[in-house]
């Protein structure tokens, strides 16, 4: 058995990209599947990753709001997507609003530049074996 850790993530939305970038940064080899551009949902229009439906989808930044608190926790944990969002933010009062196309392009570039991430466009093949879960070795 190889000592190289590998995982597969299905979907290059916000959560899939954040997870892939974080795991790859920890040395895990990631295969990231994204169905676009072969298949689009009714809400999506471009082939990029982390495509937001609304420019203010990232919501409020106040720490007394759930979305603001979540973003602060993500910052403290080393989020890759929040700096990307902040780089393409647009004025929206107390919300973190972004230029959606620029944000998607920036996240797509981050993911594609990460050497531990292999992007597969299209739907993943059906699994022929049961899912395996990895747990760290006991101390």
Provide a role label for each language-model segment.
Residues 2, 25-27, 114, 129:
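Short, well-ordered coil/turn elements that cap or connect secondary structure elements
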Residues 6-7, 57-58, 94-95:
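Short, contiguous strand/loop micro-motifs
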Residues 21-83:
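N-terminal FAD cofactor-binding segment of flavoenzymes
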Residues 73-139:
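Feature captures the FAD/FMN-dependent oxidoreductase FAD-binding
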Residues 5-31:
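N-terminal Rossmann-like FAD-binding beta1-loop-alpha1 element of flavoenzymes
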Residues 15, 19, 70, 103-107:
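General structural feature for long, well-ordered alpha-helical segments within catalytic domains
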